[in-house]
Amino acid sequence: MKLGIINGWDEASFKYVAELGLHAVEFCCNFYVDSMEVAGHTDEIKALSEKYDVAVGSIGRWGETRVDENGEAIPAALQHDKNLIDAASALGCPVYNVGCNWTEGKTYKENCEIAIRYFGQLIEYAKGKNVKIAVYNCDWGNFVHGEKA
């Protein structure tokens, strides 16, 4: 196990993590950041990871509205998740953190079924990429948390 912290994907961030004596970093590429900010720069990020001996331990995207009012995947949101799964794979990052928003007008059971479908698409997409899908334990754009979940 490597200890790390949440930080950015620029050189100053990798240098800072290394100066702390840590060997892992987690990227939070949240809903207000284009996923290509990470996914479009994996060669540069990988070089920084190697230069500073700081592995990318996980990548996550918090706060995204992933399903619409009918419980269907929003194509742009799904594409951001796929971009970041691809980035994780390219960087040797083993975990992608994700949530699923609540759909108003649906029951808890229906919302669970919607989330399972959404997560299932990501799990299927990540097959063969050496990336596991994890659900973050926070309510920011996610109802799958707490005791009931």
Q: Which residues does each PLM region occupy?
A:
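N-terminal pre-domain/capping segments
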Residues: M1-P94, K127
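Active-site acidic/histidine proton-transfer and metal-coordination neighborhood
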Residues: E50-K51, V67-A149
